[in-house]
Amino acid sequence: MPLAEGSTFAGFTIVRQLGSGGMGEVYLARHPRLPRQDALKVLRADVSADGEYRARFNREADAAASLWHPHIVAVHDRGEFDGQLWIDMDFVDGTDTVSLLRDRYPNGMPGPEVTEIITAVAEALDYAHERRLLHRDVKPANILIANPDSPDRRIMLADFGIAGWVDDPSGLTATNMTVGTVSYAAPEQLMGNELDGRADQYALAATAFHLLTGSPPFQHANPAVVISQHLSASPPAIGDRVPELTPLDPVFAKALAKQPKDRYQRCVDFARALGHRLGGAGDPDDTRVSQPVAVAAPAKRSLLRTAVIVPAVLAMLLVMAVAVAVREFQRADDERAAQPARTRTTTSAGTTTSVAPASTTRPAPTTPTTTGAADTATASPTAAVVAIGALCFPLGSTGTTKTGATAYCSTLQGTNTTIWSLTEDTVASPTVTATADPTEAPLPIEQESPIRVCMQQTGQTRRECREEIRRSNGWP
C-alpha cells in the first residue's frame, strides 16, 4: 500500500508520491535532519524479502553512492524499515526526456538539443565506466532535466538501480528487466553475456535514436519480436524515419552494431560523432578510434548464469507476447472466413497496445475477445498460438500452432535468428523451392528462409506462409 502524505518512513516525512512501478514507489520526502527534500525510493516488502535481491540491492546502492558527477543523480543513503528496503537520492525538480517527447516533440527533438543531452549522459557514463561501474538501464525515462526552460538547466542520469561492477555476474534478472529496458538493451545484455561499457553505449545510441525520431529503433507490440530484432535484425537506418537525418546513418550503424567490438569504444566518441554529423559541437573525425575505457578483465561467462538469467527474464516477456499472438491469429481466421463473401464489410474500432515508450495501433478482432490471462486460455492453458517460421524468443520455448501441433523456438541454421519450427534445436536450411509472386519485390534472405521453412513443414502455399509470418512479426 502506498505511503500516505504526511506519514513518516525511516524518519523521512512523506510529502507526495512521485511515481510507482513493479518494484515499489518513489516519494518526495523531507529529510529527517537536514532542511531539504529528497527522492525516497521504497521497495515492496516481497521484493525486499528476497535474500539474493537484498544483497544485490545493497551492493549496487553502495556502488551508486560512490559516484560524484554533475550529470549523475547522487545517492545519499540506504537502509531498511519495517521490512522494506529504501534508498535516498537527490530530488530533481524538472522533467524527463520521455515527457519532453510526449508534450513538446512527439516527432523527435531538435538535433542541437539531442546533442546536448546525449553528450551530458555520455560523460556521466564514461565517468562511471572508468570506475568499473555500468548503468545497464540507459533509456529516456532515466534522463532527467532540472529547470528545463532555464539557460542553466541540468541534465542528469538517474537510477543506477541496476548498476553493477563490470565483472559482477548479477545485474540483468527478471526482477529488474522491464519492457522499457528491452527497447534499448544491447544484444549481449539480453543474452546474459559478459558486459562492458559498450553495452551502455548501445543503449545510449538507442536512446538518441528515440529522441531524434520520436520512437526507438525497434518497436513492436510483441516484446519478444523486439528482442529478436535486437539480436538479429540489421540496425535501422535513421534516414528512413527522418530523411533529413540520413547523414547519421553510419553513426547509428556503428553505435548499434551487434558485436561490441564494432561499436564506439567510449560513449563520448558516439556523442562527438553525433554532434559532428548534426552540425553541432562534435568530433570532426568521427571515425577515429579511441582507447577503450580501462576496466578489469571480466569474469568468465557462467553457463549456469546464462541458463538461469535468460529464460527467467524472457519468460516474463513471453507471457505478454501470448495475448498479442492470440489476437493476431483470431483476426487472421476472421479475415480468411470473410474472403468468400466479397460484398461483406466488417468495421472494427482500433486498439492500441503499448510497449513503453512507443505504441503500435492495430485493428481489433472482429470477434469479441477478452484480454490478459483470458487470451492465453483461448489458445491453450500452457502455450501460445504461433506461426511456423515467425520470430520467437526465448530459444527452447514451446508454443502451439493453429492446427494444435507443438512448435519449438529453434535456431535457423547458419544464423542467429530464432523461429518457430515443428522440429527442436537447429532448423535445417529449407530445401523446398518457391516461385515468388511477380507482383512482390524480392525479399531479403532473412525473410525468405523462414517462409520456405513454413512451406516445407506445413505444406501451406508461399502466400499463406508469408502472410502468417508477416502478421506475427509485424512486418509491413
Curated annotation (Swiss-Prot):
Interacts with Rv1747. The gene is pknF. It comes from Mycobacterium tuberculosis (strain ATCC 25618 / H37Rv). It catalyses: L-seryl-[protein] + ATP = O-phospho-L-seryl-[protein] + ADP + H(+); L-threonyl-[protein] + ATP = O-phospho-L-threonyl-[protein] + ADP + H(+). The modification Phosphothreonine is found at T8, T13, T173, T175, T287. The active site is at D137 (proton acceptor). GO terms for molecular function: ATP binding; protein kinase activity; protein serine kinase activity; protein serine/threonine kinase activity. Residues 12-279 form the Protein kinase domain. Phosphorylates the FHA domains of the ABC transporter Rv1747, the heat-shock protein GroEL 1, and Rv0020c. May play a role in the regulation of glucose transport, cell growth and septum formation. It is found in: Cell membrane. ATP binds at L18, G19, S20, G21, G22, M23, G24, E25, V26, K41. This is Serine/threonine-protein kinase PknF. The keyword Nucleotide-binding applies. Pfam families: Pkinase. Its EC number is 2.7.11.1. Belongs to the protein kinase superfamily. Ser/Thr protein kinase family. The chain crosses the membrane at residues 306-326.
